[in-house]
Curated annotation (Swiss-Prot):
It comes from the Viruses. InterPro entries: Kinase-like_dom_sf (IPR011009), Seadorna_VP7 (IPR009973). This is Non-structural protein 3. It comes from Banna virus (BAV).
Amino acid sequence: MNNGQATITRNGGRFEIRCRHLDRDYTMPLPNATSNDNFLDCIKFITECVGFDYVSSGFKLIANVNDFQHLNGNSTLLIGKTKIGPLILKKVRSLPCCNDALFRNEFRILAKMHGILRLKNDVNGHKYGIILERCYKPKINFSNFVTAINDLDVFHSSNQHLLHGDANPDNIMSDSEGYLKLVDPVCLLENQVNMVNIEYESLTQEAEKKVFINSLLQLVEKQMSATIDEIYVNLKEVNPSFNLEHGLKLSDLLDNIDVYNSDHWKLMLNHRPMMPELSVLNDLTYYDTGEVRDLVTEDLDDEDDV
């Protein structure tokens, strides 16, 4: 790493990367490495199964950005084909060595981060790609709607300065279990705000919560092909649901509770939340960049984010 040094060490049964950068020491866990052999097996697995064929003498995995395409029109979120399925990368300009908590995946609201690849041939100077968990087009029911609001609150409560920074509808996806995730955590990874979502009234957690809930409501409207005034919530069901026929009008519900208080939402769940089933998990064409043209934006530049 530039202006610093790093080494892989063993701490009991765990491996860690210990870094010294700009006179500060950092530690980043390697959660998938449990022994020397296992660590080498991880390298072998990624090169043979995921498809990367170049590893430097320092066991640095290299990815060529020319082998990837843009996901959902996002200039710094890439998708590449591999033998075991799609690989999703978030491009960043600097190594996020001080954000080891993110790589421990403590926050369910954030898409899991599995590791870091060094990038080649990026015209705008992005040096690293963060490997993100495979997420899917969002599918929302009342349970994961409320759970997501609570998950964001848990994330915010862990540190008063933590912000995702861009909680718009395009950055909300479903994971393999049906939970809603925020992807594209560039502000967290780079420890700075490089752009401001125009929907944010200010760079505060309260402003982010408002943007996030409004984004969820937009996704519900899109999914139901209806406006908020036409959507109902049946709170009498064991697991309340959005529908177009019976229950309490969603617009009335929003008028009668503190929308931005996660505790008010949680009181409406009568049972252990049931996540929606994702049929896309069995649809191998979902990430087929050769067929699904709307995943790719032609001539998109890294500086096009708004």
